[in-house]
Amino acid sequence: LFSEDETPNWPPFHQFDQIIQTRACEGEAFYDGILSPNLTQDERNVVVQSYAGLLCSKQFYHYVVEDWLQGDPAIGKPPPERTQGRNKNWQHLYSRDIISMPDKWEYPWFAAWDLAFHMVPMAKVDPGFAKNQLSVFLREWYMHPNGQLPAYEFHLDDVNPPVHAWAARRVYEIEKESDKPDRNFLTSVFQKLLLNFTWWVNRKDDEGNNIFSGGFLGLDNISLFDRSSDVPMGGRLQQADGTAWMGFYCSNMMQMALELARDGDRHAIAYEDMASKFFEHFVQIVDAINTHGGTGLWDEIDGFYYDQVLLDHEVLPIKSRSLVGLLPLIAVTVIDEDQLDKLPGFRKRFEWFLKHRKDLARYIIHSRTGKKRWLISAVPFQRLQRILIRLLDP
């Protein structure tokens, strides 16, 4: 199709080879500025093809939940049970955006936690789009008023791992490496993530003891039963991965707050306070996963973290050695002397905590040599050694 005053040259495609060659040269020049010069040609080809797949997964996605529930008036009313079916609690969701799909051919629908992972490499080639994608799912036409993020169209209520903070932080850091830190982006997502974090704490920590459930949590075909549903034998599920993910969430929110507090403007003290809050919450989660009820979710005999079912005041570990029990390894962060030097309010609270909460400070390891650093990990050193035996056992 073309306008009558823009009749194409004839014969068609006579410049095809030249145009393709020009675009190929432009692509090579673009990746020269992104990729390491130390890559072999084969390695470079793999990376470029991977980025091509990532970039080609953008798709226009239009899904208005309220319209779907009410049906198309030109066709007729849908069955009344639809209004009480899936996604009925998401009538605010109005998706009309270009979104990065898991795969727009095989999986042509958004998956919020897949998208978060994908935006980290995307930040290398299109940081603006990466920031847009992470921001849009925190906007009021996606995020639920209670703070939950939508999962995917066939079950928006599903609960996936809270990786949005990590992805936003990494995208910010990648841009910062190019001397283009977007603090407005970091500030905006931090504020919205406070709502999501609160939703997790209020909805997935049933007893307020820093041991979390969560349900499915993205690990396909890894559980002995569908963790999105009730426990088959009754009782309540306590999840090693859910608790680890929340420790991971805390650590990233703490680091984001520390970064925002470094500005030294009139809002800095508020971010120092938030950093202290997430630091202490992180340590409390670390303590819970290791000591709640005795040894937390740790099995001393097997040397592994397990999900547990609480049934009639009895704790029943689900002894399946899977990634569920390895995920506590990701709940780790480092605080260094430079951060403390620039943030006197955070330093004061940090030092108070080390002095007066020795029961929890035992999870904080101070470097013995060189630059002063403090390591906080959900997995104490002795337990790490035992987990690695399971992980690396041939």
Which residues are covered by each model-predicted region?
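Acidic, mature catalytic/reactive cores of soluble proteins
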Residues: L1-P394
